[in-house]
Amino acid sequence: NWHLWTGDPSGGYASVQTSLGCPFRCSFCCINAPFGEAGIRLWSPDNAAAQIEALVRDHNITNIKIPDEMFCLNPKQVRAICHRLIDRGLGSRLNLWAYARIDTVGDEEMLALMRQAGFRWLGLGIESGSRHVRAGSSKGAFDDGDVSAAVRRVQAHGICVGANYIFGLPDDTLKAMEATIALACELNTEWANFYCAMAYP
């Protein structure tokens, strides 16, 4: 119920997929298990915008989640979707929510366009306050400064951040988990989710 954040519980809720899969190989993630390999397939921007427009026009649904693992991976794709939503006059009506990696939100122009197109929330996979733990799970080489800068960059464009953290990754220690809590407190994002790592067969 992310739309309740703004105090407007009247709208419905829907989900629209604009891509499938992920090109990364984070060791804790099973998104690519069904496909046997890392990769991503994109729906066309016209298709994505048309689905969102139909939800607004035909069902008065303006609270829409885009559950793609890597929505911000391809700035060209993101811009194309945003332009189509703006051209349809939907930006001011929408409350969109999407997911991204820390190292895919460096494009200021893209973030500004996303806000204009109706994106109000971005879920960021931070996972751990320890660079060693992140690297050990193939999460990326970014450090805590990169994490903080990415969060502030997104927020500066009027987009709320939902931060995601995981406890119990293979290299996690008590000290690393304390660092994760400290980072979460320091960032103080609008929302935070804390998960426990789970082994899967």
Region spans (language model):
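Radical SAM [4Fe-4S] cluster-binding motif and immediate context
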Residues: 1-162, 182
